[in-house]
Amino acid sequence: MERIKELRNLMSQSRTREILTKTTVDHMAIIKKYTSGRQEKNPSLRMKWMMAMKYPITADKRITEMVPERNEQGQTLWSKMXDAGSDRVMVSPLAVTWWNRNGPVTSTVHYPKVYKTYFDKVERLKHGTFGPVHFRNQVKIRRRVDINPGHADLSAKEAQDVIMEVVFPNEVGARILTSESQLTITKEKKEELQDCKISPLMVAYMLERELVRKTRFLPVAGGTSSVYIEVLHLTQGTCWEQMYTPGGEVRNDDIDQSLIIAARNIVRRAAVSADPLASLLEMCHSTQIGGTRMVDILRQNPTEEQAVDICKAAMGLRISSSFSFGGFTFKRTSGSSIKREEEVLTGNLQTLKIRVHEGYEEFTMVGKRATAILRKATRRLVQLIVSGRDEQSIAEAIIVAMVFSQEDCMIKAVRGDLNFVNRANQRLNPMHQLLRHFQKDAKVLFQNWGIEHIDNVMGMVGVLPDMTPSTEMSMRGIRVSKMGVDEYSSTERVVVSIDRFLRVRDQRGNVLLSPEEVSETHGTERLTITYSSSMMWEINGPESVLVNTYQWIIRNWETVKIQWSQNPTMLYNKMEFEPFQSLVPKAIRGQYSGFVRTLFQQMRDVLGTFDTTQIIKLLPFAAAPPKQSRMQFSSLTVNVRGSGMRILVRGNSPVFNYNKTTKRLTILGKDAGTLIEDPDESTSGVESAVLRGFLILGKEDRRYGPALSINELSNLAKGEKANVLIGQGDVVLVMKRKRDSSILTDSQTATKRIRMAIN
């Protein structure tokens, strides 16, 4: 009570009130605020008052031996006073100037190597061209972009191991460098940075920039590759944009771009083969992009594109949980639905079986040139807010949303029959049938959709069936907005499954991707894509198929030859001959095949008629299912260069030309490699030389396994027996001699014995 009275008394004095309200009372709290913790609370102020002092810097004692006490102007560079609390010296900023001008010069050779990303950036900017500035409304949408040009694509963990190995090789800790790229980079960097005096920490930071992809979720209108993102602040503002052409490409952008092209080509090709999934995997594993295996790139590269994601799903990698329809990426932001099969009638009274999504859901739709927010109920579009670069792009988004809504008026707007097929000539599923139909012509769809009066809402306008904007009326539920819809920002990846026909589903069975979603756009890859798979020979046209088929036979001639004589059917069914069939006129394929197979059988039966060049030349024709006929051919036709060209059964032609003296084979004038004929096929004498050191025992004996080629004989142990294939496609049984002394006589006896064994 006493205290309260005392306080009241104090408060009655005007001075007390002033002290309490106007002056800082608890100095301790403020002092604490600015002195506790190592974090500087007001860095710029601190810098200013420190630099106002005479000796604001502390330096190692050695500085006194390396820097004079005064400079040329007589100003003191360091103080004799020791720094309180450490054994360092107090130094003036002038000492730094002196050091920069007169200090020792170390080697600069490592700077461009360590700071490579900066030097490269300067070069790109130097050679880049900046165009005019345009003032206009910018529709920016946030996208996940790569902010770090010129990086490799290592994971954070892989990069960490490389950095530790390069910068701190003697530190303890297990480092496992497994991938091809890790080993190459480590070796390269160790050589580059020998005797490097730059601080290891700095080197580590810079290496990280070079090795790891850094992404940010940034508002972008325009180019999204890293060489555009590095100048984002120069090329687009809120109401202006400046044209810019980068002064150089970087490998990471090239890889992203080439990966998309390779993946699209592979998915398109796999979709039309007998077993799409197996074919896709075979192609992914045998393709290289810029010299790196495609599967390695897929494992490391986070690019999200329909074809790339299908390839990743096939390899068992996780992908984004968003799904694709009509070239737009859909991400459900709220609501849920259950699926039910329903039969609907089109305007042409065709019955379609569609999977209806029952329930209220909201989605974001993000495409290349347009974005939208879609709210839908069961078979009803509630609202669609679209923004896009131009009328065309906005129309594309509206069509996709209308089809996706599964509304009845959309299905009734179909005129004519729906019979679209995919590349493999299979009918598309109903949703894609509808989509294709309206993408061709959406006039009826827009006319029948219905129109409503609209309220005036800032930043939104209506759009009429002819795609003209309006402030009074709009197609029902549809508005065009100035603002873009951001891409889905999460980098979360989910486990998915893929079926034989390349349909990718999430764990709840929703289809996320299918080959129908893969873009038909064809670009030119910036890095060389090498498809080793025979399935991709067609990509460069008929000539490439022809050359590749014959090159394949020549490269594998040793094994092909054995199969030709022992297991021809297996040889004819090889997938490498599949592309060739498209060059042979359909009507006559079967007859050609029957004719060639009969010819080959005669060669096997009649001694001395084995002819390497002829077998190679005619082999691809034998791959088609044969038709039995008595027809004989002197030439076979292939469709290349837009017309039928002839391959002569006996002799050379412009399509297939073998030069006996140079042993070179040219296909359509292109070199297809060296063809080593079996040692002088007209006489059997040369075989004897090859079979030196072997005793010929007689005819082929199946118990000793399949026939080896002459080259494979060297692997036999002394005394071991084997069947061997000799020049004319004949097989004999031989034994490797136990003693080398008798080798000389082999040549003479071999010739006699071969003849006896065969006859």
From Swiss-Prot:
Recorded hits in Pfam families, A to Z, give:
Flu_PB2_1st (PF20947), Flu_PB2_2nd (PF20948), Flu_PB2_3rd (PF20949), Flu_PB2_4th (PF20950), Flu_PB2_5th (PF00604), Flu_PB2_6th (PF20951), Flu_PB2_7th (PF20952)
Which GO CC terms are listed, alphabetically? host cell mitochondrion; host cell nucleus; virion component
Gene3D superfamilies per record: Polymerase Basic Protein 2, C-terminal domain
Q: Which InterPro entries match?
A: Flu_PB2_2nd, Flu_PB2_6th, Flu_PB2_C, Flu_PB2_CAP-bd, Flu_PB2_middle, Flu_PB2_N, INV_PB2, PB2_helical
Record's SUPFAM superfamilies?
Answer: PB2 C-terminal domain-like
Q: Where in the cell is it found?
A: Virion; Host nucleus; Host mitochondrion
- Short sequence motif named Nuclear localization signal, residue ranges: 736-739
Q: Which GO terms describe its molecular function?
A: RNA binding; RNA-directed RNA polymerase activity
The answer on whether this UniProt entry bears the keyword Transferase reads: no
Where is the secretion signal located?
none
Enumerate the UniProt keywords alphabetically.
Cap snatching, Eukaryotic host gene expression shutoff by virus, Eukaryotic host transcription shutoff by virus, Host gene expression shutoff by virus, Host mitochondrion, Host nucleus, Host-virus interaction, Inhibition of host innate immune response by virus, Inhibition of host MAVS by virus, Inhibition of host RLR pathway by virus, Inhibition of host RNA polymerase II by virus, mRNA capping, mRNA processing, Viral immunoevasion, Viral transcription, Virion
Question: Could you say which protein family the record assigns here?
Answer: Belongs to the influenza viruses PB2 family.
Q: HAMAP family from the entry? A: INV_PB2 (MF_04062)
Protein function = Plays an essential role in transcription initiation and cap-stealing mechanism, in which cellular capped pre-mRNAs are used to generate primers for viral transcription. Recognizes and binds the 7-methylguanosine-containing cap of the target pre-RNA which is subsequently cleaved after 10-13 nucleotides by the viral protein PA. Plays a role in the initiation of the viral genome replication and modulates the activity of the ribonucleoprotein (RNP) complex.
UniProt name for this protein: Polymerase basic protein 2
Cite the source lineage: Viruses, Riboviria, Orthornavirae, Negarnaviricota, Polyploviricotina
Whichever gene encodes this chain, its name is PB2
